[in-house]
């Protein structure tokens, strides 16, 4: 009598495939399945932005979100107005008491280390729909210590799609830095790279003064649609700095 082959179902321990890190596997599955939660986050964020701007794009999905962000920047009388509007949008995404309690109870623990590390992890988990693939990394603090409170964005989808330094700076970088510090008690500096569209978040570190921030002196991107329109009306453009940065 021949022995019957025993067919063993795959165990939980053997999944995901050994060749793929668990975090990378889960991320690939989320995107492969259409990203239900990504769609929820996108729709919520766009809804809040539309309420602030008072206008919506006819385009669906992410393309429409970028058009609303562009409208927010172009219709604001000053860059400060754009930043303040973007901060209000970020605040509207959270229950007010949550922000207050986080700033009061979590932010002071261990000199801000716990809060910075927590926010970095939450950002990496929940914001890929907006920025694209990102990972938590270590950042060096001014006192010489290191915290795992950084988030490295490989290629920011928001910057790549908007193609605009001004949108990056005024609707993302500056308002996010201000929101984190003022409403969550966590200092943050964001360092976008306009050459490869990567971005480094450093939670727990104060941003430089405006006059020392090289990001605010960036020229317009060659592919910026707003810069292209300006060139159609005038040749006297300061190409050394984006007028909206």
Feature locations, PLM:
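Generic structural hydrophobic/aromatic packing signal, biased to beta-strands
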Residues: 126, 151-153, 176, 190, ...
């Amino acid at each position: 009598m021949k022995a019957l082959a025993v067919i063993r179902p795959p165990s939980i321990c053997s999944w995901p495939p050994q060749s793929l890190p668990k975090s990378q596997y889960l991320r690939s599955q989320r995107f492969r399945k259409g990203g239900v939660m990504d769609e929820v986050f996108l729709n919520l964020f766009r809804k809040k932005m539309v309420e602030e701007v008072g206008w919506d794009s006819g385009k669906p999905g992410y393309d429409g979100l970028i058009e609303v962000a562009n409208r927010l920047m172009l219709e604001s009388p000053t860059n400060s107005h754009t930043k303040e509007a973007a901060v209000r949008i970020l605040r509207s995404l959270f229950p007010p008491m949550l922000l207050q309690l986080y700033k009061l109870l979590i932010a002071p623990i261990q000199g801000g280390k716990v809060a910075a590390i927590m926010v970095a992890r939450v950002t990496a988990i929940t914001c890929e729909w907006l920025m694209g693939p990102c990972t938590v990394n270590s950042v060096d603090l001014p006192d010489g210590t290191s915290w795992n409170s950084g988030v490295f964005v490989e290629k920011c989808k928001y910057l790549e799609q908007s193609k605009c330094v001004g949108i990056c700076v005024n609707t993302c970088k500056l308002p996010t830095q201000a929101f984190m510090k003022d409403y969550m008690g966590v200092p943050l500096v964001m360092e976008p790279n306009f050459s490869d569209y990567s971005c480094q978040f450093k939670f727990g570190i104060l941003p430089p003064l405006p006059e020392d921030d090289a990001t605010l002196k960036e020229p317009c991107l060659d592919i910026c649609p707003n810069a292209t329109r300006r060139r159609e009306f005038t040749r006297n453009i300061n190409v050394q700095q984006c007028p909206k940065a």
